[in-house]
């Protein structure tokens, strides 16, 4: 295991006191932060790598709590459409032509983008997840992986998948990659999956000792349909089935009542917020302040590149706080330090990496460095505000995961970026250039 010393760096710790340390040192031994501030005199002599932190700001790495990483192949393919047509005319059609190899290269392209933007871990929800797990192993990132399943029969599933097949994936990959790969079950949503199928998925999750990741309450139409079919909101419906009795990531939760929010809080459900997708598809902006006030674990996600077009948690943080400040007519809500916690430790807890998301002795060494020697990041009155409101993803120039450097001075160390760019684009053009067919239909 290697030893890394980051010298003379400013650090946003995101600890309980929200300490910001100036001109400090961070010592990493193996996977763990072993010193913050004063470092043992002989550590520098024994260090395998010394990083000059002058003009840099360190903070915990970002966690993407909801993404469809291989959809990077569909970036720019489904533009300027409402949600139903976006799914029915573009996304679910293109997915009928996907291959396992497409998934690998799409996930690899996404991994390049995520590492470059300071994302150290992601919760992925897509198909052929063995291929995504391969990318996680090779890249050095962390992930919570869910194989998406609809429960509509093999002819309506990508790759003719089944719940049994997704269970086998869980058993193969849980805690692989030296603990960096975690798994969960991925029934798509209560508006696609029947109550019987959701109950089967829940029982299997309990048997396997894992959680569930699904989409919840993305539109008013979904809520109305749930009330008509089940007599309950989507959140209440899932709670009545017992789905929230296992660790649950309920992506979006845009249309939730006060009673729904109470359920989410009481069941410790994570609600990832993906604002750029909501804006692009004109879906709404959600009730983030109300959920946080009630104690819901709101984390940040990006959703897939087909609806967001980028995989940038910093952008999600910025849009979330700006939209909610404007919606609530309250400039004091969701301050920068809180947004950084949503982007880091809230996601870390949701993905099962609770020992990350903070800079302190004993925490996992998941650290990113922003290069602050830039005009748009000076002066440094408020480092957290500079990052949330001024920084770009391209300002990240070091990424460390479990004590391993994945990005050094802006260069990827674990992935062949040139080859990935070439192969991913070739496969993306092939994907949309062949015969495709709708394999299921989204109905309001």
Language-model segments: what does each one mean?
Residues 1-24, 28-29, 341-444:
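Active-site microenvironment of metallo-dependent hydrolases
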Residues 9, 26, 31, 55, ...:
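Divalent metal-coordination and catalytic microenvironments
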Residues 73-105, 112, 139-161, 220-247, ...:
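Active-site gating loops and adjacent loop-to-helix segments of metal-dependent hydrolytic enzymes
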Residues 75-141, 163-176, 425-436:
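Alpha-helical scaffold segments that flank or form the walls of functional sites
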Residues 123-126, 184-200, 279-281, 350-352:
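Active-site glycine- and acidic-residue-rich loops that bind
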Residues 131-254:
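Metal-coordinating catalytic core of metallo-dependent amide/deamination hydrolases
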Residues 240-247, 289-374, 390-391:
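His/Asp/Glu-enriched, well-ordered alpha-helical/loop segment
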């Amino acid at each position: 295991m290697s030893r890394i010393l980051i010298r003379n760096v400013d650090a946003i710790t995101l600890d309980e006191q929200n300490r910001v340390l100036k001109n400090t040192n961070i010592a990493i031994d193996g996977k763990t932060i072993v010193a913050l501030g004063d470092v043992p005199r002989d550590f520098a002599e024994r260090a395998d790598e010394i990083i000059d932190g002058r003009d840099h700001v360190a903070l915990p790495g970002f966690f993407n709590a909801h993404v469809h990483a291989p959809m990077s192949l569909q970036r720019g393919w489904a533009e300027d459409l409402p949600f139903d047509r976006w799914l029915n005319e573009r996304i679910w059609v293109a997915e009928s032509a996907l291959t396992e190899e497409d998934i690998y290269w799409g996930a690899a392209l996404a991994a390049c983008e995520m590492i470059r933007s300071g994302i150290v871990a992601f919760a992925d929800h897509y198909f052929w997840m063995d291929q995504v797990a391969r990318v996680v192993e090779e890249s050095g990132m962390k992930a919570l992986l869910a194989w998406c399943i609809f429960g509509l029969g093999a002819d309506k599933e990508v790759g003719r998948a089944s719940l049994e097949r997704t269970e086998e994936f869980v058993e193969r990959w849980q805690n692989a990659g030296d603990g960096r790969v975690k798994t969960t079950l991925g029934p798509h949503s209560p508006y696609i999956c029947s109550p019987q199928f959701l109950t089967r998925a829940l029982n299997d999750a309990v048997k396997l000792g894992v959680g569930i990741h699904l989409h919840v309450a993305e539109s008013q139409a979904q809520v109305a349909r749930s009330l008509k079919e089940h007599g309950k909101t989507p959140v209440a419906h899932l709670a009545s089935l017992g789905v929230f009795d296992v660790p649950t990531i309920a992506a979006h939760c845009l249309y939730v009542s006060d009673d729904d929010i109470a359920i989410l809080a009481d069941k410790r459900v994570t609600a990832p917020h993906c604002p750029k997708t909501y804006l692009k598809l004109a879906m709404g902006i959600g009730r983030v302040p109300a959920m946080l006030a009630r104690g819901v674990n709101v984390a940040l996600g990006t959703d897939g590149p087909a609806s967001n077009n980028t995989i940038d948690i910093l952008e999600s943080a910025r849009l979330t706080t700006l939209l909610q400040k404007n919606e609530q007519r309250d400039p004091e809500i969701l301050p920068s330090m809180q947004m950084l916690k949503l982007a880091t430790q809230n996601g870390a807890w949701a993905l099962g990496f609770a020992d990350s998301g903070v800079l302190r002795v004993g925490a996992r060494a998941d650290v990113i460095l922003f290069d602050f020697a830039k005009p748009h990041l000076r002066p440094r009155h408020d480092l957290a505000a500079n990052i949330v409101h001024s920084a770009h993803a391209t300002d990240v120039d070091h990424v460390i995961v479990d004590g391993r450097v994945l990005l050094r001075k802006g260069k990827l160390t674990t992935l062949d970026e040139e080859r990935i760019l070439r192969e991913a684009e070739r496969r993306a053009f092939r994907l949309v250039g062949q015969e495709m067919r709708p394999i299921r239909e989204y109905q309001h």
